[in-house]
Swiss-Prot record:
The keyword rRNA-binding applies. Its main location: cytoplasm. The keyword Protein biosynthesis does not apply. It is found in: Cytoplasm. This is Dual-action ribosomal maturation protein DarP. Residues 8-18 have a biased composition (Acidic residues). Belongs to the DarP family. It comes from Bordetella avium (strain 197N). The lineage of its organism: Bacteria, Pseudomonadati, Pseudomonadota, Betaproteobacteria, Burkholderiales. Member of a network of 50S ribosomal subunit biogenesis factors which assembles along the 30S-50S interface, preventing incorrect 23S rRNA structures from forming. Promotes peptidyl transferase center (PTC) maturation.
């Protein structure tokens, strides 16, 4: 049986190389502070978002109470209570979901970038439409051509604008939405 690199080697008596049988106080404090910080992040969330997380009812109610508490000392005590309840919560799952909400999933972001690049190619070149139609043979060709034509016309009009004038983006967005609905 191999020992993972992240664990401290333990001998037959159950002690690590430093002679301790449990994590150090400093390590425990770091973990508790991390849970407290996670609890503070949860307190800042809306009730709708909180309901989407895998929280026990007691923790959910403690977070809602902290959100309603206005007094400084009472709020501080409630935050620490939330931190204490966080010890039993699935912190990794919660962090993962918060990361998705804050940054979006990488797959979604990559898909959006691909669609934006395709939109630029469609506006610039007719060959891109042929490529697109070969990938999606069931696409509404007439609608796509109309949206592309309108986006090209809009791009030409935007190129002729004077400095300080606001460019139009309606057809540009419509083309993106058409591509998005096509790929879903």
């Amino acid at each position: 049986m191999s020992i993972p690199d992240t664990e401290i080697p333990v001998d037959d008596d159950g002690y690590d190389e430093n002679g301790y049988d449990r994590p150090s106080k400093s390590q425990v404090k770091r973990e508790m502070h991390a849970l407290l910080d996670l609890g503070k992040q949860l307190i800042e969330l809306s009730p709708e978002r909180l309901r989407q997380l895998p929280l026990e009812e007691r923790l959910y109610e403690a977070i809602r109470t902290a959100q309603r508490t206005t007094g400084r000392e009472g709020r501080r005590r409630q935050i620490h209570f939330v931190g204490k309840l966080m010890r039993a919560a699935p912190a990794d799952d919660i962090r993962r979901q918060l990361d998705v909400w804050e940054n979006g999933s990488r797959e979604e972001t990559a898909a959006m970038h691909r669609l934006e690049g395709l939109r630029e190619r469609l506006i610039a070149d007719d060959e891109a439409l042929t490529e697109l139609l070969s990938r999606y043979p069931g696409a509404d060709v007439q609608h796509l051509r109309a949206v592309i034509r309108a986006a090209r016309k809009e791009a030409q009009q935007n190129a002729a604008l004077l400095q300080g004038q606001e460019p139009q983006r309606k057809q540009y967005r419509a083309l993106f939405q058409a591509l998005k609905s096509l790929t879903q």
